């Protein structure tokens, strides 16, 4: 299977950016890998370690409220949501996936702050493992690119 062509920005520069990360602890093996890949990519893009604030919440449904608290402080240039929702035998998967995603999007629009949504939704653990590193790094690139874009538009 071929991956989607995501395109790449010319040059991403995170040197002056402050980034907030909210990571769900549920499925921590996956979310820890997402966070590690995300932070490594932020550093590679020039974001200073001291300008990265990372917090953890119990699960994906709690991510939006922590993002909101960060957005209200008006200290961050971009935020990143990290989580992993694996389909189970109940409707709960759809509820958590839909509500966490809607919350992240609403906050980005309400606060006019870029939020890279790397709350991955998968059918099984194998899919989560296959996506964890790539999606974490993708989230970092999205956050830096969108922070720079919104700065240029203001």
From Swiss-Prot:
One of its GO terms (biological process) is riboflavin biosynthetic process. Belongs to the DMRL synthase family. Keywords: Riboflavin biosynthesis, Transferase. It is an enzyme of class 2 (transferase). InterPro entries: LS (IPR034964), LS/RS (IPR002180), LS/RS_sf (IPR036467). The gene is ribH. Pfam families: DMRL_synthase. It catalyses: (2S)-2-hydroxy-3-oxobutyl phosphate + 5-amino-6-(D-ribitylamino)uracil = 6,7-dimethyl-8-(1-D-ribityl)lumazine + phosphate + 2 H2O + H(+). This is 6,7-dimethyl-8-ribityllumazine synthase. The lineage of its organism: Bacteria, Pseudomonadati, Pseudomonadota, Betaproteobacteria, Burkholderiales. Pathway: Cofactor biosynthesis; riboflavin biosynthesis; riboflavin from 2-hydroxy-3-oxobutyl phosphate and 5-amino-6-(D-ribitylamino)uracil: step 1/2. Catalyzes the formation of 6,7-dimethyl-8-ribityllumazine by condensation of 5-amino-6-(D-ribitylamino)uracil with 3,4-dihydroxy-2-butanone 4-phosphate. This is the penultimate step in the biosynthesis of riboflavin. The keyword Transferase applies. (2S)-2-hydroxy-3-oxobutyl phosphate binds at residues 89-90, 131. GO terms for molecular function: 6,7-dimethyl-8-ribityllumazine synthase activity. GO terms for cellular component: cytosol; riboflavin synthase complex. 5-amino-6-(D-ribitylamino)uracil binds at residues 26, 60-62, 84-86, 117. Its EC number is 2.5.1.78.
């Amino acid at each position: 299977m071929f991956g989607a062509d995501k395109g790449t920005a010319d040059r991403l520069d995170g040197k002056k950016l402050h980034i907030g990360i909210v990571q769900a602890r549920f499925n921590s093996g996956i979310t820890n890998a997402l966070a590690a890949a995300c932070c490594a990519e932020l550093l590679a893009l020039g974001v200073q370690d001291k300008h990265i604030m990372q917090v953890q919440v119990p699960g994906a449904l709690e991510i939006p409220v922590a993002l909101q608290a960060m957005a209200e402080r008006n200290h961050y240039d971009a935020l990143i949501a990290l989580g992993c929702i694996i389909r189970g035998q109940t409707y709960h998967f759809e509820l958590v996936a839909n509500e966490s995603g809607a919350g992240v999007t609403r906050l980005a629009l309400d606060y006019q702050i870029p939020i890279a949504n790397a709350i991955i939704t998968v059918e099984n653990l194998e899919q989560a493992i296959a996506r964890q590193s790539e999606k974490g790094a993708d989230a970092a690139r999205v956050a830096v690119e969108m922070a720079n874009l919104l700065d240029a538009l203001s």
